[in-house]
Amino acid sequence: MGKNRKSKRQLVRDEKRAKKRGLEIEHEEERDIKKQRREEEAHQDAFAPVTDAGYVPPPLDGTYDENAFPGGPEEGRRNGPNTNFEREFFGMLAEQEQEYFRHADELLELNDFPSTEERDIFLQNVYKELRGKELKVASSQSCSRLMERLILLSNTRQKKSLFDAFGGHFISLVTHRFASHCCEKLFLQSAPVVTQELSGEYEQEPLPEGEEETEAMKSSMEDLFLLTLDELEEHLGYLLTDRFGSHAIRALLVILSGRPLDQAGTKSMLQSRKKEYITVEGAAANQSELSSQIRAVPSSFTMAIKKIIDDSTMTMDATALRVLAKHPTGNPTLQLLLELELTMFVKGKEKKEKNKQKKDDEEAEEKKEETQSEVTLLGMLVPDAPAAFADNTTQAAEFVNSMIYDPIGSRLLETLITHCPGKIFKGLQQHIFGPRIQSLLRNDIACYPAIKVLNRLSREDLADAVEKSLPEMASFVDKGRFNVIRTLFERCHIRNGTDEINALLKALTSAYGNDWKKLVPKLCMLDEDVVEEEQKPDPKFQTQEAKNKAFMLNHGCQLVAALLAIPGQPSKAIQASLAALKPAQVMKMATTSHNTSSILVKALQTPATNPTFHKVLVSSLLPHVYELATSQQGSAVLNEIISLPSKPAEPNAPAVPFHMKENIISQLANYESELRETWLGRNVWRTWKGDMWSHRRHDWVRWAKETDPETARVAAIPRKREEKEKEEAEKKPKGYLGKNFDPKKLKGFAAKKFEKKEAEA
């Protein structure tokens, strides 16, 4: 047989295709560079013209160009327009270099190396090839992902070498579309090293043969971060509103503050929802534990944060701050600056002042004058607070009122309400939020700052807010403000407001026809057609109506879960509603979405107000065991059942009868081959120990009863009658003569002995 060889025509065609593909990649990079330059030029042209006369006032209609320099036209006059630096172009990689780095990226993405030593050797070879081309690779569309993966797998010495390569070019890199992601990754991955060096736990890696040690490798990571900040310092005003640079500034602020890097709130602050998640298989195991906890940072980092806040706000006036507060890019950075100032400096000063004893009245007055003379970001946003909140014409009151209903500015207001000192919060509550709390809770934007206010209210103020909100309960339900209702219930439970909880439950039930059974079907939308999570389209292609329905379902399920966690009437109402559901509705809850299935899991974990509650809930699921086992949401409900005991340890404690567990495992055994074909089915089969059931059933029974109380695990062993009587006699108190003892029936010696004992007693 002849060998399958390509013809000459096919080889020529493949060569043409490869050249065409290479040209397309080059053209794509050129187009991206030209597009970025056009955007920069357009951004520069957006600046308001500034004359030598000084400040250019905003238009009379109250509008302001959000693309203007965040420091206002005065800063533009002093520092020049936003382009007070020249964006560098680092050149393009050759075709062979691109091919090499692309292949290295594929190998690193799989991370399928025989051992860590071979991977380290491969990384060293890549770094040798990368030497002198770091800036080109970081700013390349096709190879910047390689740089991010290299940073994930690099040791401390290699990270310091990248700081050395990027040094002097950070302002161009952090504002670049692709290189900015590499800088963020380098900052975040290097943050734990600062704490390790500070505590003395860091050990220097050995220098590879043939490599010279640079000055950056000898320097500490703290010094490298401070040098980076020095380089970015003069451009902070521009970076606050830059599309890419603002993310790098936020990352640096989080690192300097020592906050955890892996928390969900931190990640949402640092990156947008559209950001591509670059990772390496198995790289998560190499990450330091310091990323998920509060880190110790040197004092120089705290001073750097203070300097960044001062430099960022020094050249701004009230108008520029309002523009920045409503700027979609500048607002998150301003939130972080305000939060750091309030948590690290304002509250720290208050604690110190309380702990220190004032020696003289004169010294106390001098301290007050000094603190009043200091210009802070909080003081610029709400000057003369809290006294200024009493007058609606003051700058502080106007700022708060203008931000309440703004979709972007309200987020800054949430940060202010959450972290501001108690005196300022009392002024906000007394003059702005308290009198109209019920109308603010009705609004789809203002309800979020109002919820933050509810979280800080005292017992008396919360009772007043609940009293004002009770007549609006029907409106809350119609508009889908379930997050507002949930917050009211949770805060009343924390503040031990039993009367308020009962009043809220009564108002909520009346909005649904005074019937507890309607709560879960209405709040979880069981009567409406809801698309399952597996069949949902991409969020980009969802209609606004579908998105609103998803949000309402999410908030409704959160409300049900909150009511279920509150003992007393709220938990009783939700359990009664769950017990009244039809089997089809329970099955829909278990398989439709994670929000609804989590309610069933929590219901199985909650103590029952009705002894048959858990039994009724599980019996509704018994006919659909296979469907639950192969469902992503239903499998979690099924796995929760086996973790519950068969007999309750205490009255009304969660329990599922053992015969129901046997019924479920026998049904799973009938579908064993089908379950083994899917990952979810294998997970359920493993959790229920199906192999043990098939081969060693008596061991499975013993294992299934391990969750039962100690005395209820096995049946009692038959014993002799004499042993039983002996045990019963030992349990009886001394001198016990039985229930039916009658001393009048005693005769002779027994009667005399009883009389003697009675006389002695």
From Swiss-Prot:
It holds the Pfam family PUF_NOP9. Residues 1-56, 350-372, 712-739 are annotated as: Disordered. One of its GO terms (cellular component) is nucleolus. GO terms for biological process: endonucleolytic cleavage in 5'-ETS of tricistronic rRNA transcript (SSU-rRNA, 5.8S rRNA, LSU-rRNA); endonucleolytic cleavage in ITS1 to separate SSU-rRNA from 5.8S rRNA and LSU-rRNA from tricistronic rRNA transcript (SSU-rRNA, 5.8S rRNA, LSU-rRNA); endonucleolytic cleavage to generate mature 5'-end of SSU-rRNA from (SSU-rRNA, 5.8S rRNA, LSU-rRNA); ribosomal small subunit export from nucleus. Pumilio repeats lie at residues 129-164, 165-200, 231-271, 395-430, 432-467, 620-666. SUPFAM superfamilies: ARM repeat (SSF48371). Residues 11-44, 350-371, 719-733 have a biased composition (Basic and acidic residues). Signal peptide: none annotated. InterPro entries: ARM-like (IPR011989), ARM-type_fold (IPR016024), NOP9 (IPR040000), Pumilio_RNA-bd_rpt (IPR001313). Keywords: Nucleus, Repeat, Ribosome biogenesis, rRNA processing. GO terms for molecular function: RNA binding. SMART domains: Pumilio. It comes from the Eukaryota. Its main location: nucleus. PANTHER family: NUCLEOLAR PROTEIN 9 (PTHR13102:SF0). RNA-binding nucleolar protein required for pre-rRNA processing. Involved in production of 18S rRNA and assembly of small ribosomal subunit. Belongs to the NOP9 family. This is Nucleolar protein 9. It comes from Sordaria macrospora (strain ATCC MYA-333 / DSM 997 / K(L3346) / K-hell). The gene is NOP9.
